[in-house]
Amino acid sequence: MIPPHIHILDFNGIYEEQRILKSLAEFVFSKKIEGIRYMVLPEKIPEIENILPSHLGVTFLGDGEFHHLTYFIIKKIKRPFVLVVFDNHLDAREEEFLTCDSWIRKALKLKHLVKVVVVGTQEQEKIHRVFYSETDPQKILKLLGRHPVYLSIDKDVLDIGITGWESGRVSLEDLLNVLRHIPLRKILGADICGEPDPLEFWKMQESEKVNLSILSALFFEKLHYVPGSEHLEGKPAHVT
């Protein structure tokens, strides 16, 4: 079986040294766009929607300040689904604009979103159709019910300290265990953010290893897919 569609949105050069990851991608957008970090200015919305891939897959968003771009991806889903978010923070503030702190609140207004399951957060607030869970695969599967799932992973949920934010409490092993338990047939797509600060270049290699581990647990192991030598050598993907 073929691997999933892998897309990289590299707005600040954060994936420049992640050569193996880039070699697995079918599409890499590498260009700085003003007015989208932390929040999306209304006039930037058409530009963002234009660069997003037309089909779902696995999208790498950069650092956590771009997590709100998940909203534009899941807005394309036209069937009932559950959103599962792995995040050290609850990005559900009441704000006028779409920001990295408010995107879940905005997403709850989407027609086809049934519920949100937030895993690993240290912030909990009673919000209609938002559920909380630790890394318990059976509880998470029960919350999914019969619906397909879209997964959004901010690596600041992990306890290994590779992001530009404070570390969470979830071990990489526990995160991967949850991902392995979600049947491939239920996964609509996923995105991953939480890259290191660009100045902390010594964290880049470890961050790439985590990205590859997540891809493996989500898809490669289930598909019995082994990347070829061209990927292991880090040959470049198509870059825009």
From Swiss-Prot:
<dbReference type="InterPro" id="IPR006035">
    <property type="entry name" value="Ureohydrolase"/>
</dbReference>
<dbReference type="GO" id="GO:0046872">
    <property type="term" value="F:metal ion binding"/>
</dbReference>
<dbReference type="GO" id="GO:0008783">
    <property type="term" value="F:agmatinase activity"/>
</dbReference>
<dbReference type="GO" id="GO:0033389">
    <property type="term" value="P:putrescine biosynthetic process from arginine, via agmatine"/>
</dbReference>
<dbReference type="InterPro" id="IPR023696">
    <property type="entry name" value="Ureohydrolase_dom_sf"/>
</dbReference>
<dbReference type="Pfam" id="PF00491">
    <property type="entry name" value="Arginase"/>
</dbReference>
<protein>
    <recommendedName>
        <fullName>Uncharacterized protein TM_1158.1</fullName>
    </recommendedName>
</protein>
